Amino acid sequence: MKGIKVVETAFRDAHQSLLATRLRTRDMTPIAEEMDRVGFFSLEAWGGATFDTCIRYLNEDPWERLRELKEHVKRTPIQMLLRGQNLVGYKHYPDDIVRKFIEKSYENGVDVFRIFDALNDIRNMEYAIKVAREQEAHVQGVICYTISPYHTLESYVDFARELEALECDSVAIKDMAGLISPHDAYELVRALKEETDLMVNLHCHCTSGMTPMSYYAACEAGVDILDTAISPLSWGASQPPTESIVAALRDTPYDTGLDLEILKNIKKYFEEIRKKYSSILDPIAEQIDTDVLIYQIPGGMLSNLVAQLKEQNALDRYEEVLEEMPRVRKDMGYPPLVTPTSQIVGIQAVMNVLSGERYSMVTNEVKDYFRGLYGRPPAPLNEEVARKVIGDEKPIDCRPADILKPQYDECRRKGEEMGIIEKEEDILTLALYPAIAPKFLRGEIEEEPLEPPAEEMAPTGEVPTVFHVEVDGDEFEVKVVPTGYMTIEEAEPEPVDVEGAVKSTMQGMVVKLKVSEGDQVNAGDVVAVVEAMKMENDIQTPHGGVVEKIYTAEGEKVETGDIIMVIK
């Protein structure tokens, strides 16, 4: 048998899974040439959440990141994760945007396009696959792996046949939550090798603890490629350690042929990077969590879910959110939990828990999901929930992109009017993220500070522990024994109660004000849209009247309970 090829994920999925996608380009380029020497099948370095995080938190141009990496990586193909018709966003984009984005991605340095759809709806992948093939790139079609009564071995094999019919070069089993058991990995890989002529790539996270065993079972079944992460960025919600997998397969028919000495140097570099980012590294994302076999939360989502709950000052509700997620997933027809459905399901679970009433608050993305605008769910929707979310609306049954009008020229016009377009890629950035891109392109985004790790203990010897105290002429020796150190946080201000106030239901950014001062509105009208946890939330007025005062502006951040406007 031929040896196993390896995809290294340190530049994309590994830090997305453990560091909330916060790794800076300046911390990638110093080691990129060394990684290029290893002989990986590819370096996954772009796509996924990296695009969003670059412009939202890091004040980095994601296109420039791609170009810089390509300058350092000459031999190893650079791979990106592309969400089919969603590209690197959270909704469907029209075909003209998809074409331009893929063409520019290839032009700037992407060699391998790993293309998936969160619902395994082939209609949402066809056009992206077609355009990527036109670039003569390596096109890898993806099966999003999950477990439900509707996801069977036969259904996965049938889907792989559809990908082969579209002339993909390889197929990836994308196990976002580390759910696949050794037995199931063997059976699925063997079936794909028997029923198709495609190279098979297994991509797993270590969340459940089973992944190294599943990798070896996949090798025995004939897998061609495995995804791994250099050890300081491995385990937990990330992939298995590259060095461990290389060593485990050495002197077997599956030997990768990779040099552990070169990998050791790369490991040392990332050990320092891990220390640098230790304030972001969350213990929840690092640990093995067998509850994932119940909740099915993917690796990349765990660290982001923790970060988002922290933003809402609701980390104490984490367990409740985990328990709510399978219920929401069932209501929505058992979608695989991968972007964007992981965000859609996860944030709805957060809202159900924080609001105290299921589906009393619903994001626009959830409404669109029930309308069929993300594609065909694997299973029937909960009809009662559907009525609560979209009323009597009938979902569409065509390819969602078929009802979208071309947007590229309009985005160009808007961007030029705003004076924010310097290159063609800026038009695409604006098209993908119209809420945040203008601020980024105007240079108004500040890089999120990377805080040093908190000191666990005060330096010894600097704080006196024995005091001589005189009381009414008598002297006493008092020993003070340290028992820990307290972090003092600012108290939360009490919310102001103003008559007629319309308040934000979530912490986030105001992306749209739908009324002006002096407008007449009715109870239930949508008066603003707040983007919270990357999803848009309509703010409805609980009462009618005239808009007396607006206290915020588009692009400004608001906290939960902040007054957006007063209507009397």
From Swiss-Prot:
The organism's lineage? Archaea, Methanobacteriati, Methanobacteriota, Methanomada group, Methanobacteria
Per its database record, what is this protein's job?
A: Pyruvate carboxylase catalyzes a 2-step reaction, involving the ATP-dependent carboxylation of the covalently attached biotin in the first step and the transfer of the carboxyl group to pyruvate in the second.
Known partners and oligomeric status: Heterooctamer of four A and four B subunits.
Quote the protein name from its UniProt record. Answer: Pyruvate carboxylase subunit B
| Organism for this UniProt entry | Methanothermobacter thermautotrophicus (strain ATCC 29096 / DSM 1053 / JCM 10044 / NBRC 100330 / Delta H) (Methanobacterium thermoautotrophicum)
**What Gene Ontology terms for biological process does this UniProt record contain?**
gluconeogenesis; sodium ion transport
Q: Which GO terms describe its cellular component?
A: cytoplasm
What one GO molecular function would you report for this record?
Answer: pyruvate carboxylase activity
The chain residues annotated with the modification N6-biotinyllysine are 534
- The superkingdom of the source organism is Archaea
User: EC number(s) on record?
Assistant: 6.4.1.1
Residue spans making up a coiled coil are none
Query: What reaction gets catalysed by this protein?
Result: hydrogencarbonate + pyruvate + ATP = oxaloacetate + ADP + phosphate + H(+)
Which cysteines pair up through disulfides? They are none
- State the temperature dependence of activity: Optimum temperature is 60 degrees Celsius.
